[in-house]
């Protein structure tokens, strides 16, 4: 049988099962309300398993503990069914002595995936399993589509992403990944608020896309009759708030970048950005190390983070190395003279595979070389510092070397996880850098920034010395859950429509 014939046979089988389940639903409708909403549970499956884990069969029988549970049927073995709620699973026992004939007849028609409500008392089987000996049970929701085969699950990766709701039903590991994601975000929020940061919300629709070097999504505001952009970063609005007197702010929200899709990139992604006045980028490095250690300990119970065949050590001091020095360290065949000669640097960048357009300055070329020859080699946590000013239009120049900025990017496993710098608060310097970005855009750089006159005006009122940082939540969760693709940690990643 060919793959096409097999697919057709499986589809026909599924269609027949759906038709049978629809007949059962029609019978439920004929009885009255087929989708009741008057049941209130008083227990979760996992809580019961934990609370009564040490109770013996005899102790449970004597206590006769009443419970109300609800969940989806995941296994049906006649006398015993296994139901699943958001916390876990528990068995329920179909007791012919305590259930009515009508109920027993109804139970026989139920299918895997149906959602039921059960009342009864806790008991323990001869094998030691906790279960609910039901005194009443009823159907709450009829499932019309059969779940994937229990032995094989939902294994097609694309279908898992397209039908995440099914993926979540049948795969506990997937549910745990998204529980961890929620934990991570909650802890980040708590971590910052304990340090007097104020959570804020800034516009998702912007008239000028700014705060990052990226290509935006464009849209049209009908009421105002104007072009607008989905934000690529909230940075410029958050710094306006620092100007306004909110000296410590953060936002956890979506950014949108109209760029490629890969295991590390999704056009819609979640970012933490935070800003604190009277601090610099080195303060942010210390804060970031502390946060990452806490998150690893919270999720894994250890500061050693396994990822694939590697282990990242969050408990050790993160390496701190400049862009320039990192190129020389990981490429000993290159010299400082090579990197400081624009013609040689251009040739090295081209040979390494960078897309050199011809208008790049020396600093831009050095970063291109770093991205091609160094980035993927940074396995253990590295703070890469002192990015050239021409690729850091919003960062403060370094006091000792004005050709570079007080900036770092954090790399773990060869991936950028965070980007931070001491913020540029010189309004005149900012205006000049915006003009340089406009020139780059005119020369063909789609990712160069626009000129934002209102942001320059805000700086003219005076912004205190400030440090800011952005951390990619999705990539961070990938690390902490050992997930190989960014799509594994986004509930509904972007997919092409099915034909």
Curated annotation (Swiss-Prot):
Cofactor(s) of this protein: Mg(2+)
Residues engaged in binding Mg(2+) 1: 409, 416
Protein's cellular compartments: Cytoplasm
Keyword Transmembrane included in the entry's annotation: no
PROSITE patterns to which the protein is assigned, alphabetical: AA_TRNA_LIGASE_II (PS50862)
Binding-site list for Mg(2+) 2: 416
Annotated cofactor note: Binds 3 Mg(2+) ions per subunit.
Domain of life: Bacteria
Single GO MF descriptor: magnesium ion binding
GO BP terms in the entry: lysyl-tRNA aminoacylation
Assembly: Homodimer.
NCBIfam families per UniProt: lysS_bact, PRK00484.1
Protein name per UniProt: Lysine--tRNA ligase
């Amino acid at each position: 049988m060919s793959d096409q014939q097999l697919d057709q046979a499986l589809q026909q089988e599924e269609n027949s099962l759906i038709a049978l389940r629809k007949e059962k639903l029609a019978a439920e409708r004929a009885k009255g309300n087929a989708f009741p909403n008057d049941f209130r549970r008083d227990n979760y499956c996992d809580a019961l398993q934990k609370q009564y884990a040490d109770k013996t069969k005899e102790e449970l029988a004597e206590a006769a503990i009443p419970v109300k549970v609800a969940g989806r049927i995941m296994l049906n073995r006649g006398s015993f069914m296994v139901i699943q709620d958001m916390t876990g699973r528990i068995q329920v026992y179909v007791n012919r002595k305590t259930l009515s004939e009508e109920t027993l007849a109804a139970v026989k028609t139920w299918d895997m995936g149906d959602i039921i409500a059960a009342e009864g008392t806790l008991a323990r089987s001869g094998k030691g399993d906790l279960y609910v000996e039901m005194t009443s049970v009823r159907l709450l929701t009829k499932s019309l589509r059969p779940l994937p085969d229990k032995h094989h699950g939902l294994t097609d990766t694309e279908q898992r992403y397209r039908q995440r709701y099914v993926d979540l039903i049948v795969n506990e590991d997937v549910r745990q990944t998204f529980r961890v994601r929620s934990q991570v975000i909650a802890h980040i929020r708590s971590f910052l608020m304990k340090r007097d940061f104020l959570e804020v919300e800034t516009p998702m629709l912007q008239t000028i896309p700014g705060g990052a070097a990226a290509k935006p999504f464009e849209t049209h505001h009908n009421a105002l009759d104007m072009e607008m952009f989905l934000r690529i970063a909230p940075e410029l609005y958050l710094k306006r708030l620092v100007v306004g007197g909110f000296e410590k702010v953060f936002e956890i929200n979506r950014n949108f970048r109209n760029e490629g899709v890969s295991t590390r990139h999704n056009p819609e992604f979640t970012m933490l950005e935070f800003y604190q006045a009277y601090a610099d980028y080195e303060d942010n490095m210390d804060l970031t190390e502390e946060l990452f250690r806490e998150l690893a300990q919270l999720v894994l119970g250890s500061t050693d983070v396994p990822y694939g065949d590697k282990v990242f050590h969050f408990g050790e001091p993160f390496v701190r190395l400049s862009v320039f020095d990192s190129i020389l360290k990981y490429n000993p065949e290159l010299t400082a003279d090579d990197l400081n000669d624009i013609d040689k640097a251009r040739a090295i960048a081209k040979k390494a595979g960078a897309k050199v357009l011809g208008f790049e300055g020396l600093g831009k070329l050095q970063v291109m070389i770093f991205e091609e020859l160094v980035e993927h080699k940074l396995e253990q946590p590295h703070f890469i510092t002192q990015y050239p000013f021409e690729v850091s239009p919003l960062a403060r120049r370094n006091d000792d070397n004005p050709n570079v900025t007080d900036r770092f990017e954090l790399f773990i496993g060869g991936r950028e996880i965070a980007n931070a710098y001491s913020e540029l608060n010189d309004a005149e310097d900012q205006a000049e850098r915006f003009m340089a970005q406009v020139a780059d855009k005119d020369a063909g750089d789609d990712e160069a920034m626009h000129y934002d006159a209102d942001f320059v005006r805000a700086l003219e009122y005076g912004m205190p010395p400030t440090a800011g940082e952005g951390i990619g939540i999705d990539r961070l969760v990938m690390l902490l859950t050992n997930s190989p693709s960014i799509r594994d940690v986004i509930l509904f990643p972007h997919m092409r429509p099915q034909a």
